[in-house]
Amino acid sequence: MRILFLGTPSFASEHLEFLIKNNFDVVAVISQPDKPKGRGKKVQPTPVKEVAQKYNIPVFQPTKLTSEGLSIIERYKPDLGIVVAYGKLLKPPFLNAIPFYNIHASLLPKYRGAAPIQRALENGESVTGITIFKIGEGMDDGPIALKKEISVGEFETFGSLYEKLLSLGKEALLEFLNNYPPNLYPQEGVPTYAPKISKEDLELDFSADYVTVKNKIRAYDPIPGVRSVLKGKIVKLFQVFYVEADENIKEYGKVLKINNEGGFISAKGGIVGIKYIQFPGKKPITFLDAKNGGLVKEGDKFES
């Protein structure tokens, strides 16, 4: 079975390397064009391109996928395409040239779109998973080939859930290819969407419900991290370890207590325990270290 692989970030490159190491015949790879990254704004190859080059697999980065993609298919004659976080919608006639299947990090039709892991955490989902589906002309709306579920812990972070879904995605991909072609069935249920992360999404407001605060911190931990303001400085907060309902709280964002577990902050309807705080230009440190360093104390208040 000859495979054309399309993908861009590290979530995709891990799946590509998994295919190669399991001796699947990846005949060509398509990735997004390289972009400037980091403080120096140097142009760097995409993670998928790096893996393709490592294994000497032909890799292409077309700016116009429909026309250039057809010539790639004509040249390498793949039987199917595997798509993982490529970053662009596939359109006819390229889309119709071979069957394309997408590995998506949610239980479709929930969380169609670019940020399914973050949005599932933000909404406090207790279950999520991987869906492999045949790509149609809409966004993540094609018939399903395979679904795999995974539970989400109360204090699960983006980082930990990402790793679990990466492992589950590889498992699902292996099962899918070993049983190809699949028996497809339509998506059922009301679709929900997972739009790209905006700067506004990262702003933490302690006047929101305490469970909402907990979930927002988890959704962007460890990257890029939610932001709040303390004593006029923009800080980031990481690793929620505790929540408790308290309807008597009237002041939001107040540091109620700091101990070796972390900082306990008031929010609407309850208290949120947070382990790490990051000050501008510094690495994250525990709340206790920040207290001992004179950076934060009980009674201080976070502003939204």
UniProtKB/Swiss-Prot annotation:
Keywords: Protein biosynthesis, Transferase. The keyword Transferase applies. The keyword Protein biosynthesis applies. GO terms for cellular component: cytosol. One of its GO terms (molecular function) is methionyl-tRNA formyltransferase activity. Belongs to the Fmt family. Attaches a formyl group to the free amino group of methionyl-tRNA(fMet). The formyl group appears to play a dual role in the initiator identity of N-formylmethionyl-tRNA by promoting its recognition by IF2 and preventing the misappropriation of this tRNA by the elongation apparatus. PANTHER family: METHIONYL-TRNA FORMYLTRANSFERASE, METHIONYL-TRNA FORMYLTRANSFERASE, MITOCHONDRIAL. This is Methionyl-tRNA formyltransferase.
